[in-house]
Amino acid sequence: MWRNSQKWKNRASRRPQRKGEALIDKLWIFRGLDRGRMTKKTLLMHELIGLKVKVVKSSHPGLIGIEGYVIDETKNTLTILGTKVWAIPKIVAEFEFEVGDKKIRIKGEELVGRPEMRLKKR
């Protein structure tokens, strides 16, 4: 389709429109073993993408119970892939990360900030 001498992109109905939708219902193994080195303190300085996560507490009742894998992280949000793709604000939620056989709870307020800067913190 043409408009103002520019061709529009074809938005096919089967093409994913949001980031991560192509990954839904696919089996993925995101992380290996942490070898017992992951604690609450080290998780704050760690890469979160690929970890299994669950929202255990939130000021918005519709967010409680969402679980899946972290597929993207920004300064203020975590993008979680489960039965669908959610963008969860960090500031309003408390997360439970599953690392190996351990479950680590972290308030979202502790995670707020650019991921690359959080990794540099000591």
UniProtKB/Swiss-Prot annotation:
GO cellular component: cytoplasm; ribonuclease MRP complex; ribonuclease P complex
Record-linked Pfam families: RNase_P-MRP_p29
Biological process (GO), any one: rRNA processing
Enzyme class: hydrolase
InterPro entries from the UniProt entry: RNase_P/MRP_Rpp29-subunit, RNase_P/MRP_Rpp29_sf, RNP1, Rof/RNase_P-like, Rpp29/RNP1
Reaction catalysed by this enzyme: Endonucleolytic cleavage of RNA, removing 5'-extranucleotides from tRNA precursor
Domain of life, source organism: Archaea
Protein's cellular compartments: Cytoplasm
GO molecular function, one term: ribonuclease P RNA binding
Keywords, ordered alphabetically: Cytoplasm, Endonuclease, Hydrolase, Nuclease, tRNA processing
SUPFAM superfamilies noted in UniProt: Rof/RNase P subunit-like
Role: Part of ribonuclease P, a protein complex that generates mature tRNA molecules by cleaving their 5'-ends.
Stored PANTHER family: RIBONUCLEASE P PROTEIN SUBUNIT P29 (PTHR13348:SF0), RIBONUCLEASE P SUBUNIT P29 (PTHR13348)
Family the UniProt entry places it in: Belongs to the eukaryotic/archaeal RNase P protein component 1 family.
Subunit structure comment from the entry: Consists of a catalytic RNA component and at least 4-5 protein subunits.
The name this protein goes by in its record: Ribonuclease P protein component 1
Organism: Thermococcus sibiricus (strain DSM 12597 / MM 739)
